[in-house]
A protein has these predicted regions:
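Cap/lid segment of the alpha/beta-hydrolase catalytic domain
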Residues: 1-19, 76-84
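Alpha/beta-hydrolase fold nucleophile elbow
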Residues: 33-45
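Alpha/beta-hydrolase-fold catalytic nucleophile elbow
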Residues: 42, 67-68, 152-153
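Active-site nucleophile elbow and catalytic-triad environment of alpha/beta-hydrolase enzymes
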Residues: 96-111
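Short beta-strand/loop motif that positions the catalytic acidic residue
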Residues: 115, 121-123
């Protein structure tokens, strides 16, 4: 699914996914039992990417916690470095002009530049799914907001229970 309609930036599957996440926050904020001033987003991998894009697109999001976000530095392989999941251009045959241009619109790095809320961020150096070069790039472009970074060098595409507990405690403090 991650390559569905990738030849057209206006029809690419992530257009509706990103928009759907932003609209979901509006829906939640409208519920009687939800305090619209206490909405945060969190996730890992694709969920980390969606947390970042959602926080960038919807000002109702008050904080963001992300683990090893996917969909970051997607064209990295074209420039001799690792790219993030889904590794679109790892083998080169997918690298058409249209697909490359489409990724510029959906790369999480571009959304991270728009973050204006506190951030909890964690990843490891051994992740082969969302390589550390791509996840570091995302973190480095997040503007000067309150940021909490926890690098756990030995981890791969997973987290320790202590990371999850720290994230949960941080979210509770923020919200």
């Amino acid at each position: 699914y991650q390559f569905y309609n990738m030849d057209d930036k206006d029809k690419y599957v992530y257009k509706s996914i990103y928009a759907g996440c932003a609209r979901a926050v509006d829906f939640l904020a409208g519920l009687d039992f939800v305090d619209p001033d206490r909405i945060g987003v969190t996730g890992g991998s694709q969920g980390g990417a969606l947390s970042i894009t959602t926080a960038a697109l919807n000002p109702k999001v008050k904080c963001l916690a992300a683990f090893y976000p996917a969909l970051a530095d997607l064209t990295g392989y074209l420039y001799g470095r690792g790219g993030g999941w889904p590794h679109t251009f790892r083998n080169g045959y997918m690298a058409t002009k249209e697909r490359i241009e489409t990724t510029y619109y959906y790369d999480v790095v571009n959304f991270a530049r728009k973050i204006s809320v506190p951030v909890f961020y964690s990843y490891g150096f051994n992740d082969m799914t969302c390589c550390p070069t791509s996840t570091t790039t995302v973190y480095n472009v997040i503007p000067d907001v309150e940021k909490h970074l926890w690098i756990v060098p030995e981890t791969e595409h997973w987290t320790y229970p202590e990371q999850m507990a720290a994230r949960s405690n941080w979210l509770m403090d923020q919200l």
